[in-house]
Amino acid sequence: MSGKEVGVYDIADGQKIDITSTKNELVITYHGRLRSFSEEDTHKIKAWLEDKINSNLLIEMVIPQADISFSDSLRLGYERGIILMKEIKKIYPDVVIDMSVNSAASSTMSKAIITTINKKVSE
């Protein structure tokens, strides 16, 4: 890593994300330093969330620690997670979101995993 890249891990540089989903899970895989979402990506996230509005969401940010320091990997995970939460809150402002960040030396992909947690109805 050159000196000019230090501290610029999450600046959008024309790279993209991949979004895959199942009924219970949405996985956003980040390629490179991209931190923002295109309109098309936002539509994919919205489509997955449509029938989950009555659920709480859990976001797990997984950030590899191979090329950056532990503190930078945590910062990157929290920044991306907050940006993702802002996008979700624009669509569904009342949804409850919990987030965790895992910096894993063994992981090679930077990704966000969104799952649902059914709300408990108070008696």
Language-model regions, residue ranges each:
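Solvent-exposed, acidic/flexible segments
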Residues: 34-42, 70-81
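Periplasmic OmpA/Pal-like peptidoglycan-binding modules at the C-termini of bacterial envelope proteins
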Residues: 6-10, 90-123
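Short loop/turn segments at connectors of secondary-structure elements within structured domains
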Residues: 55-57, 82, 108
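Short, surface-exposed beta-strand segments enriched in small/polar/acidic residues
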Residues: 27, 50-76, 99-103
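Generic structural motif
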Residues: 33, 66, 117-121
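Cysteine-centered nucleophilic/redox motifs
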Residues: 45, 77-92
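Short, solvent-exposed beta-strand/turn patches at coil↔beta or beta↔helix junctions
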Residues: 5-48
